[in-house]
């Protein structure tokens, strides 16, 4: 994974309003079929990671486990998960994996 490019795209998603943060928001986005990619920080707890992965498996949403701390470093927002709305930005992020 090209971390430098991924960080840039993550920041762009936030500025463009294409990112959803928080457990409830991410779960709603994935369950509602609005999420093109779910990014999980490497510091996420094992139980939370499993819950997100099970939900994404049921809905067919791609999940990526990032390096610890990368999510906050790239977006400036603390948290364990970021849902990227479906569209060209999520497709670009998938292409750099």
Positions of predicted regions on the chain:
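Structural motif
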Residues: 36-37, 62-64, 79-82
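Positively charged, polar, low-complexity stretches
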Residues: 24, 28-29, 42, 47-73
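A conserved hydrophobic position in a structured secondary element of the catalytic/binding core
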Residues: 21, 66, 84-85
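C-terminal structural segments of small proteins and small subunits
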Residues: 70-97
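Charged, alpha-helix-enriched surfaces in structured cytosolic catalytic cores
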Residues: 1, 5, 47, 66, ...
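Generic secondary-structure boundary/loop-capping signal
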Residues: 7, 16, 41, 68, ...
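N-terminal first-folded block
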Residues: 2-37
């Amino acid at each position: 994974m090209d971390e430098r490019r991924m960080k840039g795209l993550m920041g762009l998603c936030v500025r463009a309003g294409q990112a959803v943060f928080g457990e409830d928001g991410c779960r709603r986005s994935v369950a509602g079929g609005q999420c093109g990619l779910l990014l999980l920080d490497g510091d996420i707890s094992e139980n939370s990671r499993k819950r997100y992965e099970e939900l994404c498996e049921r809905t067919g949403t791609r999940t990526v486990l990032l390096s610890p701390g990368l999510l906050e470093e790239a977006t400036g927002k603390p948290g364990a998960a970021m849902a990227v709305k479906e569209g060209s930005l999520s497709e670009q992020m998938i292409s750099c994996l």
